[in-house]
Amino acid sequence: MINTELHNGDCLEYMKKIPTSSIDLIITDPPYNLGKFMEERDTNLVKMRDNFFGAAGWDDLDYKEWKKSMNKFFHQASRVLKDGGSIIVFMAIIKVETIIQLAQKHGLYYKKTGIWHKSNPMPRNMNLHFVNSTESWMYFTYKTKTGTFNNNGKVLHDFIETSVTSNSEKKYGKHPTQKPEALMEHFVKVLSNENDTILDPFMGSGSVGVSAVKNNRNFVGIELDENYFNIATSRIKEVKKDEI
């Protein structure tokens, strides 16, 4: 039977309680620390920043504080990962170098930076500049240069294209940076095996958890915001059809 463990609170505190070398795969989408960056720009994105970016908690932190928090995250991530375990971290392209440097300090081997392309992005400011249709992700393994990689003989590109999150995946509520299940399921299937344990310390509305449970993986999720935690819990319960 697949086990799920969900926590509403600070991931830096809850991760300390996770046993060492107990996690096979981490997939997570931490705050991008774009809040203050957007606030200081003289554009009409300030309202979007107030409504969306600011809701992400760490996103409004001073850069040095955000970097310090991410360093603590990688310290715990490397501790809980099994040797040969993998981690996928979504991040703004302008922060990729910082994330790689922090991760490598904690024994994580940098494998790849890839792109998620949204095939139907919001056409916001389409007459002013190029529409924002991509986000980056980074792939690391712990203590080894290789890990689980279920490509089944296929060539898997580092450019992944899906539509944005559908309304059916938002029926319990919306999250401003919600990733589609199809995207998360891709990483779940390729980088883990059935009965492995997957962790998402920045769970949001639970797309990683839903994908993990659907594919017979154990799941540990942590989310600071109570509203998003409740959305994630409802989504995962629906898939699991069991009491968490």
Pin down the residues of each PLM region.
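Core SAM-dependent methyltransferase catalytic element
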Residues: 82, 130, 136-147
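S-adenosyl-L-methionine-dependent nucleic acid methyltransferase catalytic domains
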Residues: 1-122, 128, 152-244
